[in-house]
Regions:
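Short C-terminal boundary/hinge segments that cap the last helix of small helical domains
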Residues: 57-67
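Key DNA-contacting residues within the recognition helix of helix-turn-helix
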Residues: 36-37, 50, 64
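A short, Lys/Arg-rich alpha-helix, primarily the initiator
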Residues: 1-23
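Residues in the recognition helix of alpha-helical DNA-binding motifs
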Residues: 13, 27, 38, 66
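Alpha-helical residues within the helix-turn-helix
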Residues: 15, 26, 54
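Short coil turns linking two alpha-helices in DNA-binding domains
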Residues: 31-33, 45, 59
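Short, basic-rich loop-to-helix N-cap that marks the start of a DNA-contacting helix
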Residues: 41-54
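Short alpha-helical DNA-recognition segment
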Residues: 18-37
Length: 67
């Protein structure tokens, strides 16, 4: 299963968490480069998106695209 992170929702969650991308990546336990790859990916794994959401302190449903 692949998911897409919504850019706007991600930006809001990042701002609400008061984190920089680097800080969020560190919380997710990955490099900034890998973190950016996941955030900008059109097809990220559910596990990867889950790590991003956890780093931001939100539920996955709060940052993914919905159609």
């Amino acid at each position: 299963m692949s998911l897409t992170i919504d850019d706007y929702k991600f930006s809001i969650a990042l701002a609400n968490a008061g984190l920089t991308v680097g800080q969020a990546a560190e919380r997710a336990g990955m490099s900034r480069q890998r973190f950016y790859m996941i955030v900008n990916s059109k097809r990220a794994t559910a596990q990867a998106v889950g790590r991003v959401a956890k780093a931001l302190g939100v539920d996955v449903t709060e940052i993914i695209e919905t159609n």
